Amino acid sequence: MPTYALLGATGATGSAILRCLLASPPPDLDLNILVRSKQKLLKSFPTLTTTISPRIHIIQGNSTDTIALQQCLEDASVAFMCVADNASNKGVSLTADTVTAIVTTLGMLRKLHGSAYNAPTILQLRSASLNPKLSCQVPRLVYNIVSFCLHYSHLDIVKACEHYEAAAAKGLLSYIYVDPPTIHDAFGPNRTGHKLISCKPDVCDKQETALSYADLGAGFVEIASRKEDFLNQPVGVTATGKAKETWGVLAGFLFDGAKGRARAWWEEERPMSKPQNLFLYCVMVSLAAVVLVQYTGTMNR
């Protein structure tokens, strides 16, 4: 009787995973769901209160609350880690803070269960931008733009990954990094097909530039069912059909990230006058606007 844990089920990724599990649940599955707002979850998924398969257990609490995490992770063989912050601002740490709390909680569970403790496999949403074997397929200009704009979000994820790897070395958990390309059509239910990309070869299979959240959710569920194939390594997800592309939303995230970089620069103490800093701020934001056009244009070719 497997138990899965889903951390964050009201965002686009967590919702997509939940829809997939509800549509085709593994046999005899228990599903523990940790959310900040049970009311918000049930508004999106009203049938959860009457769902028989899988068996649903909803835990309301913060992702850094070890008591809530213990309830969610108890007996879990797989945990889908979907807690993240879309804002790429200096100091963002939600993902790393959550992973720190997860590691602390697993340490508590191992102490509680002793030799009967079974280390779960954590599936962490990452990004193809952080996977050299996948990011090398992206034009360098586009890669540099994305890395610049999402710098602080990427730092948060990198720190989280360092926590995973240290915990895995101690036998507390195994991890799998799930690396999609650009993700589109948040909360859209329609799947068009996906394929997993092994990152073991020196040269990976081609990754398409656009993937729907629905197909990403299905990819997560497939990885969970094949976790032994990908333990402690990254795996790419790519589309096999035509995703509904929502470049305007992604451009907004990149633009906000560029503003976050400029804001951090503005706030640093530098031997520049305010007019000079204001000029630099305007240049950076204008550059971000120009390169976003280049980014979306390149991706649509």
Swiss-Prot record:
Highest classification ranks of the organism: Eukaryota, Fungi, Dikarya, Ascomycota, Pezizomycotina
Gene (UniProt): avfA
Induction: Expression is positively regulated by the dothistromin-specific transcription factor aflR. Dothistromin biosynthetic proteins are co-regulated, showing a high level of expression at ealy exponential phase with a subsequent decline in older cultures.
Keywords: Glycoprotein, Oxidoreductase, Signal
MF GO annotations: oxidoreductase activity, acting on the CH-NH group of donors, NAD or NADP as acceptor
Record protein name field: Averufin oxidase A
Similarity annotation: Belongs to the avfA family.
Pathway where this protein functions: Mycotoxin biosynthesis
Enzyme class, spelled out: oxidoreductase
Keyword set includes Disulfide bond: no
EC code: 1.-.-.-
Superkingdom, taxonomy of origin: Eukaryota
Signal sequence annotation: 1-23
SUPFAM superfamilies reported in the protein's UniProt record: NAD(P)-binding Rossmann-fold domains
InterPro entries in UniProt: NAD(P)-bd_dom_sf, Polyketide_Oxido-like
